[in-house]
């Protein structure tokens, strides 16, 4: 799949993209799914999932702590197995798939990128809040200097206009990013909101870089939004097999492939094989199904970063406050990734309000 004869370079040299594909799908079960699993992946689980996804034809598999390189910490949650070990294991297991890793400037370091590459990662995905693309410039420079393929994540893309998002995408592309993603971190975008943002970024970047979309299921629109993104010009799409991701999960890869097959979008992934992988390999590794429940819906409706879910549940139990109330108030305050600790302040605030009201 990754040979010189089967790989077409589109727009920017060095992008892993087979000439037979219309869209490149990245499975992020082993990164976004880390949030749902509280970062407790084992080596055996990663080996089995990578083998199953690779066998189904998934071209890119992302493996990292949920919050990216260096995310194993008190604030975000400690990994059961060091992420660098998992990246190395994934790279050793995959036959055709490329292994991607995520890093957030300020959480991970340039040294982490170098180590991940040494362990077999070949696609470096760098994420910033959608208004802070400038903090990624040096990291893209390093990644390109080292021959890594680069992807940029503009997180919480629902919070700014398509025009402003396009300007931020330009910063990433000029820094060396080969594909800029519109990232619906909260699962808050609805159909046209995705299409308008993707189209604006496509128009801004032209042939300088590809455009991607990363969706969540918090309003039940992960697949539909991904279709809107493709129709607006996106060439890379994220999903998680069995919706294994933060919040209500990501767009399920097996459903994406089924729909893509129906509408004639070629991905190189076999529908039946990915459905088998979801049912027989990924599902057993999940602590529970990713549910579209009240908490998840509140996140999508209020625009809350999807990884807040487990933190809100934990703080809600600790302080005797319903998690959905914490999440709604987090949305009102427009909290972003990295501000999970403020859920404690919100919980104490609601506690005081309840006490004052005799509850």
Swiss-Prot record:
EC code(s) of this entry: 4.1.3.39
What species does this protein belong to? Answer: Mycobacteroides abscessus (strain ATCC 19977 / DSM 44196 / CCUG 20993 / CIP 104536 / JCM 13569 / NCTC 13031 / TMC 1543 / L948) (Mycobacterium abscessus)
Residues recorded as binding Mn(2+), renumbered to this chain, are 32, 214, 216
Q: Which NCBIfam families match?
A: 4OH_2_O_val_ald, PRK08195.1
Give a GO molecular function annotation for the protein: 4-hydroxy-2-oxovalerate aldolase activity
List residues binding substrate. 31-32, 185, 214, 305
The Pyruvate carboxyltransferase domain sits at 23-275
In Swiss-Prot or TrEMBL terms, this protein is called 4-hydroxy-2-oxovalerate aldolase 1
The chemistry this enzyme catalyses reads:
(S)-4-hydroxy-2-oxopentanoate = acetaldehyde + pyruvate
Q: List keywords of the entry alphabetically.
A: Aromatic hydrocarbons catabolism, Lyase, Manganese, Metal-binding
